[in-house]
Amino acid sequence: MNERKWLWVLEADIQGCFDKISHDWMLANIPTDKVILKKWLKAGYVYQNELFPTAAGTPQGGIISPVAANMTLDGLEARLAEKFPRARQRGLKMNMVRYADDFIITGHSKEWLEHEVRPAVAEFLAERGLVLSPEKTRITHIKDGFDFLGWNIRKYNGKLLMKPSKANVKAHLDKIREIIKANKMAKQANLIRLLNPVVRGWANYHSHVVAKKTFDRVDHEVWSMLWRWAARRHPNKGARWIKTKYFKTKGLRDWVFAATEKEEDGTTREVTLLKVADTPIKRHVKIKAGANPHDPQWAPYFESRWGQKMLNSARGRGKLYRVWLRQDGTCSNCQQPITMTTRWDVSHIVKPTDGGTDAAGNLQVHHLNCRRTPQHA
């Protein structure tokens, strides 16, 4: 990254975006059936058995709200590119990244973002009945970092790093704490079942950024919460008794929060709390601009991405191994051996665009240079 071209970030915050979008603008500009759209926009919402009208905006929680808001903000990037055509010509790296109503704009100077870009954004939003929040919209130097979509993005000694933001970590731990607090007398196995989806979802979301140290700290915080949960249930028991009852030893790992429960057939099963730190960190590979998964011309590209994703997951590797065994360890095309030293690939027999699935029976492995077979032999 060239610091001369990319130093400052405009962190934009739209004041009450979902509540203030102009209905007139949406009805005039969103390309859909106007009668249906108007009914959606004017339907109102019910709170405590009382109907509230919607004169502006789209109620949060409504099915159409995220789509309508996204379509309302569509075109901002094109507007900025049209207004500042010389920025790219001079290599000044004005870029915009937007997700729903959250967006950032990069620029070469604080003054340029403040006095030229910000007014252009405000003008675009005003046409749609929206305004930037004066308190929450700010311009930040990349060395100081900024939060976006749950991550903190900052330069450390010239290197740009993305980490889970402090606010996002706090929100996650607060959610874990609330679940534990609401289940003081629950069975341990039931508590684990409530926690695991939350732990897994949060860990997967951050698995593409620099998160290893954060994962370790979060695991320690959760362990502390669970120790207090267990100790409060048995105020007359000692620490050793509590550890034996609630925390197991698995292989080389001690203090694993796990419970053993009986099944209806009399067998036992162990339910174990997931550890965030067990989630591998894997860098995200950006999809090529313009790639369309529904366009047959892009099928080889998405096949390659999908195959790499299979290799990166334990479940995917197991499935590929079964396909390899089914083919007797040979290429589906040339019937020559596929080994660790040969370059190989995986593809669908019936393409997903033609209704094919990801089931093992619809997969084939072949040498990288072999043409894939269109169907089973």
Language-model-derived ranges and their functions:
Residues M1-G145, G329:
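Conserved polymerase palm-domain catalytic core
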Residues E11-A12, T54-G62, A100-T106, I180-K181, ...:
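Glycine- and acidic
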Residues A12-I14, H108-S109, W151, G201, ...:
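Residues immediately flanking
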Residues K42, L51, E127-R193, P197-W202:
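A conserved non-catalytic segment of reverse transcriptases
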Residues K187, L191-K248:
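Non-catalytic, peripheral interaction segments enriched in hydrophobic/basic residues
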Residues R228-A230, N236-M310:
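Acidic catalytic cores of enzymes that act on phosphate-bearing nucleotides/polynucleotides
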Residues A291-N333, T357, G361:
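Short, charged surface segments at domain edges that flank catalytic/cofactor-binding sites
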Residues Q335-L368, P374:
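Histidine-centered nuclease catalytic patch
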